[in-house]
């Protein structure tokens, strides 16, 4: 279904006891969700319907969880198709399960696009812009801990081990980081971004975007940085990892039909896109090198984002991205 995983195993007895906190009827079935890299997730079916159970794992700080959960409520009320947290009999939407903070969210219909077309990219671009506008009055603030300073920390943690992924990679990524940091823009329009708008986190029905899930990287950052993330995630062809300008034009045109980028945002897109590619190169390399034994999870191959990073290194004009 989506970009999720299982690190913490939940038994039927534990889940049954957990569900007693809710008016959701009896447990019918549950199944771990294999895809993704963050948190532990299960499909849960009760006599009242279908839900997603999330147990929050390594990168999520418990005191930041209200930011994510309340954001989904805020966006949903503004007409954005995203999950809602389920409130228990005690009025709480967050509680403990198996030593982790956990919540239930509503189940969204639809599925991820496996064949990403320019039409899919246009749907995504428009939805992203609507989400940016809908989040403009969200009162909470959360820094992006996987922005430029966070990349430096990841580089240090990975160190020379990057060369076991590809010879010379440690030096290459360090040089990219230094150049990106030197040229990284400031003062761009900011707001709430999803920060993980990958195809696995976006659902479609009958060719139309039907929902966005997995808001647990959401933060306040430059809105154009989200556009850059999506250029990476949506606008390269699967397998070859070649940049597809038709997809990029479709996405950026649809975005700008709702929220036009200003001149500074357009000029910054090449370095933002390169920075986004580095960010995912680093996290994928780190996760590849630090796999969790026995976890029901599929690590992402960092080679894809290393290839994208090399592409963006050659781009100096944002017109390449269709703006």
Please state what every model-predicted region is.
Residues 8-21, 139-140, 152-195, 205, ...:
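An alpha-helical support segment within catalytic cores of ATP-dependent transferases
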Residues 224-260, 274-291:
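Active-site activation/catalytic loop segments of kinase-like enzymes and analogous catalytic loops
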Residues 114-168, 188-190, 296-299:
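A cross-family kinase active-site recognition segment
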Residues 3, 145, 157, 280-323:
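ATP/Mg2+ or Mg2+-diphosphate-binding catalytic cores
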Residues 34-47, 52-53, 85, 178-225:
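Active-site acidic catalytic loop and adjacent metal/ATP-binding pocket
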Residues 1-89, 208, 321-323:
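Conserved NTP-binding catalytic cores of kinases and kinase-like/nucleotidyltransferase enzymes
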Residues 263-273:
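All-alpha amphipathic helical-bundle segments outside canonical DNA-binding/catalytic cores
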């Amino acid at each position: 279904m989506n970009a999720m995983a299982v690190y913490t195993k939940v038994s039927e007895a534990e889940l049954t006891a957990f569900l007693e906190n809710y008016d959701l009827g009896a447990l019918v079935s549950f199944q771990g969700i294999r895809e993704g890299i963050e948190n532990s997730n299960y499909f849960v079916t009760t006599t009242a319907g279908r839900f997603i159970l999330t147990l929050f794992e390594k990168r999520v700080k418990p005191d930041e969880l209200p930011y994510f959960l309340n954001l989904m409520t805020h966006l949903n009320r503004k007409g954005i198709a995203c999950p809602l947290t389920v409130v228990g009999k005690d009025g709480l939407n967050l509680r403990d399960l198996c030593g982790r903070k956990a919540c239930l969210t509503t189940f969204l219909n639809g599925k991820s696009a496996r064949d990403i077309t320019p039409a899919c990219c246009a749907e995504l671009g428009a939805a992203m812009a609507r989400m940016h506008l809908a989040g403009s009055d969200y009162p909470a603030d959360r820094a992006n801990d996987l922005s430029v300073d966070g990349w430096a920390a990841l580089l240090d943690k990975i160190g020379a081990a990057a060369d076991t992924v590809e010879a010379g990679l440690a030096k290459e990524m360090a040089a990219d980081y230094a150049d990106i940091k030197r040229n990284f823009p400031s003062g761009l329009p900011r707001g709430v971004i999803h920060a993980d708008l990958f195809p696995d986190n976006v659902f479609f029905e009958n060719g139309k975007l039907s929902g966005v899930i997995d808001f647990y990287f959401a933060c306040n950052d430059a809105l154009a940085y989200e556009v850059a993330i999506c250029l990476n995630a949506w606008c390269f062809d699967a397998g070859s990892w070649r940049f597809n300008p038709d997809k990029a034009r479709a996405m950026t045109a649809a975005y700008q039909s709702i929220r036009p980028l200003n001149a500074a945002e357009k000029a910054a897109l090449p370095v933002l896109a390169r920075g986004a590619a580095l960010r995912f190169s680093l996290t994928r390399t780190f996760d590849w090198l630090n796999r969790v034994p026995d976890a029901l999870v599929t690590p992402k191959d960092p080679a894809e984002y290393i290839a994208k990073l090399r592409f963006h290194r050659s781009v100096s004009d944002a017109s390449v991205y269709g703006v």
